[in-house]
Amino acid sequence: MSKKIKVLVVDDSPVFRALLSEIINSDPQLEVIGAAEDPYQAREMIKALKPDVLTLDIEMPKMNGVQFLKNLMRLHPLPVVMISTLTQHGADATLMALELGAVDYFPKPSVANTADMLGYRSLVNEKIRMAAQAQVGANQSMSPAVASSSAVSTSQYQLIAIGASTGGTEAVKHLLSALPASMPPIVITQHISAMFSGPFASRLDASCALSVSELTQGEVALKTNHAYVAPGDKHLMVFRRGGQLYAHLDDSPAVNRHKPSVDVMFGSVAESLKGKAIGVILTGMGKDGAQGMLQMKQQGAITVAQDEQSCVVYGMPRAAVECGAAMHIKPLNKLPQFLCDLLS
Protein backbone atom coordinates (compact mmCIF):
# COMPACT_ATOMS: atom_id res chain seq x y z
CA MET A 1 0.00 0.00 0.00
CA SER A 2 1.36 3.43 -0.93
CA LYS A 3 2.21 5.92 1.79
CA LYS A 4 -0.61 8.29 2.77
CA ILE A 5 -0.31 12.04 2.18
CA LYS A 6 0.15 13.70 5.58
CA VAL A 7 -2.03 16.79 6.06
CA LEU A 8 -1.89 19.48 8.75
CA VAL A 9 -5.11 21.50 9.18
CA VAL A 10 -4.73 25.11 10.39
CA ASP A 11 -7.97 26.87 11.38
CA ASP A 12 -9.15 28.79 14.43
CA SER A 13 -12.64 27.22 14.41
CA PRO A 14 -12.77 23.90 16.35
CA VAL A 15 -15.98 22.97 14.50
CA PHE A 16 -14.38 23.50 11.09
CA ARG A 17 -11.15 21.75 12.13
CA ALA A 18 -13.21 18.71 13.07
CA LEU A 19 -15.30 18.82 9.87
CA LEU A 20 -12.29 19.25 7.60
CA SER A 21 -10.34 16.52 9.39
CA GLU A 22 -13.29 14.15 8.94
CA ILE A 23 -13.53 15.03 5.21
CA ILE A 24 -9.80 14.54 4.62
CA ASN A 25 -9.60 11.29 6.60
CA SER A 26 -12.47 9.86 4.52
CA ASP A 27 -10.05 9.70 1.57
CA PRO A 28 -7.91 6.52 1.69
CA GLN A 29 -4.91 8.40 0.26
CA LEU A 30 -4.98 11.17 2.88
CA GLU A 31 -4.34 11.36 6.61
CA VAL A 32 -4.70 14.31 8.99
CA ILE A 33 -1.64 14.18 11.24
CA GLY A 34 -2.54 17.25 13.28
CA ALA A 35 -4.79 20.29 13.61
CA ALA A 36 -3.56 23.71 14.75
CA GLU A 37 -5.75 26.57 15.95
CA ASP A 38 -3.35 29.38 15.03
CA PRO A 39 -0.13 29.98 13.05
CA TYR A 40 2.08 29.82 16.16
CA GLN A 41 0.87 26.33 17.02
CA ALA A 42 1.10 25.42 13.32
CA ARG A 43 4.76 26.47 13.20
CA GLU A 44 5.68 24.04 16.00
CA MET A 45 3.59 21.24 14.47
CA ILE A 46 5.22 21.68 11.05
CA LYS A 47 8.65 21.21 12.66
CA ALA A 48 7.54 18.19 14.69
CA LEU A 49 5.20 16.40 12.25
CA LYS A 50 6.65 17.29 8.82
CA PRO A 51 3.35 17.38 6.87
CA ASP A 52 3.22 16.92 3.08
CA VAL A 53 0.41 19.48 2.69
CA LEU A 54 -1.00 22.30 4.82
CA THR A 55 -4.59 23.57 4.66
CA LEU A 56 -4.55 27.17 5.88
CA ASP A 57 -7.45 29.41 6.85
CA ILE A 58 -7.08 33.01 5.68
CA GLU A 59 -8.98 34.63 8.56
CA MET A 60 -7.35 33.87 11.93
CA PRO A 61 -6.59 35.80 15.13
CA LYS A 62 -3.00 36.60 16.20
CA MET A 63 -1.64 36.34 12.63
CA ASN A 64 -3.67 36.01 9.44
CA GLY A 65 -3.09 33.16 7.03
CA VAL A 66 -1.50 35.34 4.34
CA GLN A 67 1.15 36.73 6.71
CA PHE A 68 1.89 33.23 8.02
CA LEU A 69 2.16 31.93 4.45
CA LYS A 70 4.65 34.69 3.61
CA ASN A 71 6.88 33.63 6.51
CA LEU A 72 6.42 29.93 5.75
CA MET A 73 7.40 30.23 2.08
CA ARG A 74 10.56 32.06 3.06
CA LEU A 75 11.64 29.64 5.81
CA HIS A 76 10.00 26.28 5.10
CA PRO A 77 8.27 26.11 1.69
CA LEU A 78 5.69 23.33 1.38
CA PRO A 79 2.42 22.84 -0.54
CA VAL A 80 -0.34 24.99 0.96
CA VAL A 81 -4.04 25.00 0.06
CA MET A 82 -5.84 28.11 1.32
CA ILE A 83 -9.35 28.04 2.79
CA SER A 84 -11.19 31.13 1.67
CA THR A 85 -14.49 32.89 2.20
CA LEU A 86 -16.30 33.70 -1.05
CA THR A 87 -16.27 37.45 -0.41
CA GLN A 88 -14.49 40.41 -1.99
CA HIS A 89 -12.02 40.52 0.91
CA GLY A 90 -11.57 36.74 0.70
CA ALA A 91 -10.90 37.01 -3.05
CA ASP A 92 -8.19 39.66 -2.63
CA ALA A 93 -6.53 37.74 0.22
CA THR A 94 -6.65 34.45 -1.71
CA LEU A 95 -5.12 35.98 -4.84
CA MET A 96 -2.38 37.47 -2.66
CA ALA A 97 -1.79 34.00 -1.14
CA LEU A 98 -1.51 32.43 -4.61
CA GLU A 99 0.98 35.16 -5.51
CA LEU A 100 3.02 34.26 -2.41
CA GLY A 101 3.18 30.59 -3.40
CA ALA A 102 0.01 28.83 -2.20
CA VAL A 103 -0.84 26.03 -4.65
CA ASP A 104 -4.63 26.32 -4.62
CA TYR A 105 -7.67 27.24 -2.55
CA PHE A 106 -11.13 25.94 -1.72
CA PRO A 107 -14.07 27.82 -0.20
CA LYS A 108 -15.24 27.52 3.39
CA PRO A 109 -18.36 25.37 3.44
CA SER A 110 -21.62 27.28 3.16
CA VAL A 111 -25.23 26.33 2.55
CA ALA A 112 -24.64 27.07 -1.15
CA ASN A 113 -21.58 24.91 -1.69
CA THR A 114 -22.41 22.07 0.70
CA ALA A 115 -25.89 21.33 -0.64
CA ASP A 116 -23.82 18.87 -2.65
CA MET A 117 -21.68 17.66 0.27
CA LEU A 118 -20.27 14.73 -1.68
CA GLY A 119 -19.14 17.12 -4.40
CA TYR A 120 -17.58 19.41 -1.79
CA ARG A 121 -15.72 16.47 -0.20
CA SER A 122 -14.32 15.31 -3.51
CA LEU A 123 -13.27 18.88 -4.45
CA VAL A 124 -11.39 19.36 -1.16
CA ASN A 125 -9.65 15.99 -1.30
CA GLU A 126 -8.75 16.26 -4.98
CA LYS A 127 -7.13 19.66 -4.38
CA ILE A 128 -5.12 18.29 -1.44
CA ARG A 129 -3.96 15.19 -3.36
CA MET A 130 -2.94 17.38 -6.29
CA ALA A 131 -1.15 19.89 -4.01
CA ALA A 132 1.04 17.08 -2.66
CA GLN A 133 2.50 16.65 -6.17
CA ALA A 134 2.82 20.37 -6.96
CA GLN A 135 6.12 22.09 -7.60
CA VAL A 136 6.03 24.77 -4.93
CA GLY A 137 7.60 28.01 -6.10
CA ALA A 138 7.72 27.00 -9.79
CA ASN A 139 6.10 30.31 -10.74
CA GLN A 140 8.32 32.37 -8.44
CA SER A 141 11.55 31.32 -10.11
CA MET A 142 10.35 31.86 -13.65
CA SER A 143 9.81 35.63 -14.00
CA PRO A 144 10.22 36.39 -17.70
CA ALA A 145 12.03 39.36 -19.19
CA VAL A 146 9.79 41.90 -20.89
CA ALA A 147 9.38 40.82 -24.51
CA SER A 148 9.66 43.15 -27.47
CA SER A 149 7.70 42.94 -30.67
CA SER A 150 7.34 44.79 -33.94
CA ALA A 151 4.71 44.83 -36.69
CA VAL A 152 2.02 43.20 -34.53
CA SER A 153 -0.70 45.03 -36.49
CA THR A 154 0.34 43.27 -39.70
CA SER A 155 0.61 39.80 -38.14
CA GLN A 156 -1.37 36.92 -39.66
CA TYR A 157 -2.40 35.95 -36.11
CA GLN A 158 -5.50 37.87 -35.06
CA LEU A 159 -6.03 36.44 -31.56
CA ILE A 160 -4.23 34.70 -28.69
CA ALA A 161 -6.24 32.30 -26.49
CA ILE A 162 -4.82 31.27 -23.09
CA GLY A 163 -6.13 28.50 -20.83
CA ALA A 164 -4.98 27.75 -17.27
CA SER A 165 -6.00 26.17 -13.98
CA THR A 166 -4.03 25.42 -10.78
CA GLY A 167 -1.02 27.73 -10.56
CA GLY A 168 -2.46 29.69 -13.46
CA THR A 169 -3.31 32.96 -11.72
CA GLU A 170 0.41 33.61 -11.30
CA ALA A 171 1.49 32.03 -14.61
CA VAL A 172 -0.98 34.21 -16.53
CA LYS A 173 0.27 37.27 -14.64
CA HIS A 174 3.92 36.46 -15.40
CA LEU A 175 3.08 35.96 -19.08
CA LEU A 176 0.88 39.02 -19.58
CA SER A 177 3.07 41.41 -17.58
CA ALA A 178 6.01 40.60 -19.87
CA LEU A 179 4.07 41.35 -23.08
CA PRO A 180 4.23 44.76 -24.78
CA ALA A 181 1.10 46.91 -25.10
CA SER A 182 0.77 46.31 -28.84
CA MET A 183 -0.82 42.86 -29.11
CA PRO A 184 -3.78 41.28 -30.89
CA PRO A 185 -6.81 40.63 -28.64
CA ILE A 186 -6.12 38.03 -25.93
CA VAL A 187 -8.86 35.85 -24.37
CA ILE A 188 -8.22 34.00 -21.11
CA THR A 189 -10.02 31.12 -19.46
CA GLN A 190 -8.70 30.53 -15.93
CA HIS A 191 -10.49 28.02 -13.69
CA ILE A 192 -11.54 30.31 -10.83
CA SER A 193 -14.55 31.05 -8.59
CA ALA A 194 -17.06 33.61 -9.90
CA MET A 195 -16.31 35.90 -6.95
CA PHE A 196 -12.59 35.85 -7.82
CA SER A 197 -12.50 36.43 -11.59
CA GLY A 198 -13.14 40.20 -11.35
CA PRO A 199 -10.39 40.84 -8.75
CA PHE A 200 -8.08 38.53 -10.78
CA ALA A 201 -8.63 40.67 -13.92
CA SER A 202 -8.05 43.86 -11.89
CA ARG A 203 -4.74 42.54 -10.54
CA LEU A 204 -3.65 41.64 -14.08
CA ASP A 205 -4.64 45.08 -15.34
CA ALA A 206 -2.53 46.75 -12.64
CA SER A 207 0.58 44.74 -13.56
CA CYS A 208 0.38 44.76 -17.38
CA ALA A 209 0.99 47.18 -20.25
CA LEU A 210 -2.12 45.65 -21.84
CA SER A 211 -5.59 46.69 -20.76
CA VAL A 212 -7.15 43.70 -18.92
CA SER A 213 -10.80 43.32 -17.92
CA GLU A 214 -13.29 40.66 -16.93
CA LEU A 215 -15.88 39.95 -19.60
CA THR A 216 -19.17 40.82 -17.89
CA GLN A 217 -21.71 41.45 -20.64
CA GLY A 218 -23.10 38.99 -23.15
CA GLU A 219 -21.21 40.16 -26.22
CA VAL A 220 -18.11 42.32 -26.70
CA ALA A 221 -16.19 43.39 -29.82
CA LEU A 222 -12.57 42.35 -29.23
CA LYS A 223 -9.96 45.11 -29.44
CA THR A 224 -6.20 44.99 -29.99
CA ASN A 225 -4.01 45.71 -26.94
CA HIS A 226 -6.76 44.27 -24.70
CA ALA A 227 -7.02 41.00 -22.76
CA TYR A 228 -10.37 39.58 -21.66
CA VAL A 229 -10.85 37.21 -18.70
CA ALA A 230 -13.77 34.76 -18.61
CA PRO A 231 -16.00 35.19 -15.54
CA GLY A 232 -15.85 32.32 -13.05
CA ASP A 233 -19.30 30.96 -13.92
CA LYS A 234 -19.67 31.24 -17.72
CA HIS A 235 -17.89 29.92 -20.81
CA LEU A 236 -16.09 32.46 -22.99
CA MET A 237 -16.60 31.83 -26.71
CA VAL A 238 -15.17 33.70 -29.70
CA PHE A 239 -16.99 34.27 -32.98
CA ARG A 240 -16.61 36.39 -36.10
CA ARG A 241 -19.26 38.66 -37.58
CA GLY A 242 -18.23 40.38 -40.78
CA GLY A 243 -14.60 41.33 -40.30
CA GLN A 244 -14.93 41.83 -36.52
CA LEU A 245 -14.10 39.33 -33.77
CA TYR A 246 -16.42 39.12 -30.76
CA ALA A 247 -16.43 37.28 -27.44
CA HIS A 248 -19.68 36.18 -25.88
CA LEU A 249 -20.60 34.47 -22.64
CA ASP A 250 -22.26 31.10 -22.74
CA ASP A 251 -24.30 29.66 -19.86
CA SER A 252 -24.42 26.04 -21.02
CA PRO A 253 -23.39 23.25 -18.58
CA ALA A 254 -19.85 22.66 -17.33
CA VAL A 255 -17.46 20.80 -19.66
CA ASN A 256 -14.78 18.55 -18.11
CA ARG A 257 -16.43 19.61 -14.80
CA HIS A 258 -15.37 23.21 -15.53
CA LYS A 259 -17.26 26.39 -16.23
CA PRO A 260 -15.58 28.31 -17.76
CA SER A 261 -13.97 25.54 -19.80
CA VAL A 262 -10.78 25.95 -21.82
CA ASP A 263 -12.01 23.33 -24.32
CA VAL A 264 -15.11 25.42 -25.05
CA MET A 265 -13.03 28.56 -25.65
CA PHE A 266 -10.37 26.83 -27.78
CA GLY A 267 -13.07 25.03 -29.80
CA SER A 268 -14.78 28.31 -30.62
CA VAL A 269 -11.44 29.89 -31.60
CA ALA A 270 -10.66 26.92 -33.90
CA GLU A 271 -14.03 27.32 -35.61
CA SER A 272 -13.98 31.10 -36.02
CA LEU A 273 -10.29 31.84 -36.72
CA LYS A 274 -8.98 28.63 -38.29
CA GLY A 275 -5.20 29.17 -38.69
CA LYS A 276 -5.21 32.83 -37.65
CA ALA A 277 -4.90 32.24 -33.90
CA ILE A 278 -2.38 31.14 -31.28
CA GLY A 279 -3.42 28.81 -28.45
CA VAL A 280 -1.49 28.66 -25.16
CA ILE A 281 -2.09 26.12 -22.38
CA LEU A 282 -0.54 26.80 -18.98
CA THR A 283 -0.19 25.00 -15.63
CA GLY A 284 -3.24 23.20 -14.22
CA MET A 285 -4.66 19.88 -13.12
CA GLY A 286 -6.81 17.70 -15.35
CA LYS A 287 -7.23 17.61 -19.12
CA ASP A 288 -9.41 20.63 -19.92
CA GLY A 289 -8.17 22.37 -23.06
CA ALA A 290 -6.33 19.43 -24.68
CA GLN A 291 -9.10 18.50 -27.14
CA GLY A 292 -9.89 22.14 -27.95
CA MET A 293 -6.21 22.79 -28.60
CA LEU A 294 -6.11 19.76 -30.90
CA GLN A 295 -9.02 21.29 -32.86
CA MET A 296 -7.05 24.55 -33.12
CA LYS A 297 -3.98 22.71 -34.42
CA GLN A 298 -6.06 20.76 -36.94
CA GLN A 299 -7.45 24.06 -38.24
CA GLY A 300 -3.94 25.44 -38.78
CA ALA A 301 -3.46 27.51 -35.61
CA ILE A 302 -0.16 27.66 -33.69
CA THR A 303 -0.35 25.83 -30.35
CA VAL A 304 2.04 25.94 -27.39
CA ALA A 305 2.11 24.27 -23.97
CA GLN A 306 4.01 25.32 -20.85
CA ASP A 307 6.84 22.89 -20.05
CA GLU A 308 6.76 20.53 -17.07
CA GLN A 309 9.62 22.16 -15.17
CA SER A 310 7.96 25.58 -14.94
CA CYS A 311 4.44 24.28 -14.16
CA VAL A 312 3.06 24.23 -10.62
CA VAL A 313 0.90 21.30 -11.81
CA TYR A 314 1.77 19.59 -15.11
CA GLY A 315 -1.71 18.28 -15.90
CA MET A 316 -3.42 20.25 -18.67
CA PRO A 317 -0.18 20.90 -20.62
CA ARG A 318 0.73 17.20 -20.30
CA ALA A 319 -2.66 16.18 -21.71
CA ALA A 320 -2.18 18.59 -24.64
CA VAL A 321 1.30 17.22 -25.35
CA GLU A 322 0.21 13.57 -25.04
CA CYS A 323 -2.71 13.91 -27.47
CA GLY A 324 -0.49 15.68 -30.01
CA ALA A 325 -2.22 19.06 -29.65
CA ALA A 326 0.86 21.10 -28.66
CA MET A 327 3.20 22.03 -31.51
CA HIS A 328 5.64 23.80 -29.18
CA ILE A 329 6.63 23.29 -25.52
CA LYS A 330 8.16 26.28 -23.74
CA PRO A 331 9.15 27.29 -20.19
CA LEU A 332 7.02 30.11 -18.80
CA ASN A 333 9.85 32.66 -18.89
CA LYS A 334 10.42 32.05 -22.62
CA LEU A 335 6.75 32.27 -23.64
CA PRO A 336 6.38 36.08 -23.92
CA GLN A 337 9.26 36.47 -26.40
CA PHE A 338 8.14 33.33 -28.26
CA LEU A 339 4.68 34.87 -28.80
CA CYS A 340 6.17 38.19 -29.89
CA ASP A 341 8.49 36.44 -32.35
CA LEU A 342 5.49 34.64 -33.87
CA LEU A 343 3.62 37.93 -34.21
CA SER A 344 6.61 39.63 -35.83
Curated annotation (Swiss-Prot):
<dbReference type="InterPro" id="IPR001789">
    <property type="entry name" value="Sig_transdc_resp-reg_receiver"/>
</dbReference>
<keyword id="KW-0378">Hydrolase</keyword>
<protein>
    <recommendedName>
        <fullName>Protein-glutamate methylesterase/protein-glutamine glutaminase 2</fullName>
        <ecNumber>3.1.1.61</ecNumber>
        <ecNumber>3.5.1.44</ecNumber>
    </recommendedName>
</protein>
<feature type="active site">
    <location>
        <position position="191"/>
    </location>
</feature>
<dbReference type="GO" id="GO:0008984">
    <property type="term" value="F:protein-glutamate methylesterase activity"/>
</dbReference>
<dbReference type="Pfam" id="PF00072">
    <property type="entry name" value="Response_reg"/>
</dbReference>
<dbReference type="GO" id="GO:0000156">
    <property type="term" value="F:phosphorelay response regulator activity"/>
</dbReference>
<dbReference type="InterPro" id="IPR008248">
    <property type="entry name" value="CheB-like"/>
</dbReference>
<dbReference type="InterPro" id="IPR000673">
    <property type="entry name" value="Sig_transdc_resp-reg_Me-estase"/>
</dbReference>
<feature type="domain" description="CheB-type methylesterase">
    <location>
        <begin position="153"/>
        <end position="344"/>
    </location>
</feature>
<dbReference type="GO" id="GO:0006935">
    <property type="term" value="P:chemotaxis"/>
</dbReference>
<dbReference type="Pfam" id="PF01339">
    <property type="entry name" value="CheB_methylest"/>
</dbReference>
<feature type="active site">
    <location>
        <position position="288"/>
    </location>
</feature>
<comment type="function">
    <text>Involved in chemotaxis. Part of a chemotaxis signal transduction system that modulates chemotaxis in response to various stimuli. Catalyzes the demethylation of specific methylglutamate residues introduced into the chemoreceptors (methyl-accepting chemotaxis proteins or MCP) by CheR. Also mediates the irreversible deamidation of specific glutamine residues to glutamic acid.</text>
</comment>
<feature type="modified residue" description="4-aspartylphosphate">
    <location>
        <position position="57"/>
    </location>
</feature>
<dbReference type="GO" id="GO:0005737">
    <property type="term" value="C:cytoplasm"/>
</dbReference>
<dbReference type="GO" id="GO:0050568">
    <property type="term" value="F:protein-glutamine glutaminase activity"/>
</dbReference>
<keyword id="KW-0963">Cytoplasm</keyword>
<keyword id="KW-0145">Chemotaxis</keyword>
<dbReference type="InterPro" id="IPR035909">
    <property type="entry name" value="CheB_C"/>
</dbReference>
<feature type="domain" description="Response regulatory">
    <location>
        <begin position="6"/>
        <end position="123"/>
    </location>
</feature>
<comment type="similarity">
    <text>Belongs to the CheB family.</text>
</comment>
<dbReference type="InterPro" id="IPR011006">
    <property type="entry name" value="CheY-like_superfamily"/>
</dbReference>
<feature type="active site">
    <location>
        <position position="165"/>
    </location>
</feature>
<keyword id="KW-0597">Phosphoprotein</keyword>
